Amino acid sequence: STPLYSSAASDVYKRQKIGYPENWRDYAALTVDRTDYYGNVRRASEFESRRRIAQIGMPIDRGEWEMTPPTVNAYYNASMNDMNFPAGVLLPPLFDPKMDAAPNYGNTGGTIGHELTHGFDDEGRQFDGDGNLKDWWSKKVGAEFEKRASCLVKQYDGYSPVKENDKPLYVKGKLTLGENLADLGGVKLAYAAFKEARKGQPDAPLNGFTEDQQFFLGFAQGWCQNARPQMLVVRVKTDPHSPAEFRVNGPVVNVKEFASAFQCKPAAKMVKTDKNRCEIW
């Protein structure tokens, strides 16, 4: 971790939006008719367009949310330099206050770390702490970042989740770079936070798994899915996110603590040597 990264990250941390906004949007002027689906969509679109147009020339509302509270998602907004975690993403089976700390750190902690890292990925790094499009890194730091990031591009270029016309269809490393950077940064930040929280406390195994193993299992389980091949083809060609399995295996293969947690042998598929491991920050 560099001082540059740490101080800037603390600025983002101060601008968290968690659960729900302080000010609720007034929908009194929007007509909703349960018998008119098309009309509802059209009127809602018009309502939103008018609301946004009315913002032109007005002071920036840094308290505005881009997601509604029930949304099961999270985001980092570079132009606002803030993170948003709606209530929907903070509920079971993702975050569960009844669960042990380890899987919660792996799952929700990984999400928080992911969004924080977006402030320093290939796009987020182009915005300064006030949300202005400004190159605030030195040329030396920028060049080193590009060099390290190319390691991830090469790694993900080698992943193929599906075939098209009987030929392997490979993930696009450059298209997915920002999200892959955030996934890697996310799991590393979450693991560091987890170990800091558990410092000085004895390991608490559960169902035969150590705490470190529980952490990585929690990180992985959030990405369980069953996708049709046709959908995978579309996703690989257009989605800036990697397919779910590589959002797990892609990051952790670069985390040496993962290999240690599961006592992986040096020649195992999920192990990289120190020389080949992608280290960004």
What are these regions (language model features)?
Residues 1-9, 13:
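Single conserved hydrophobic/aromatic residue that forms the stacking wall/gate
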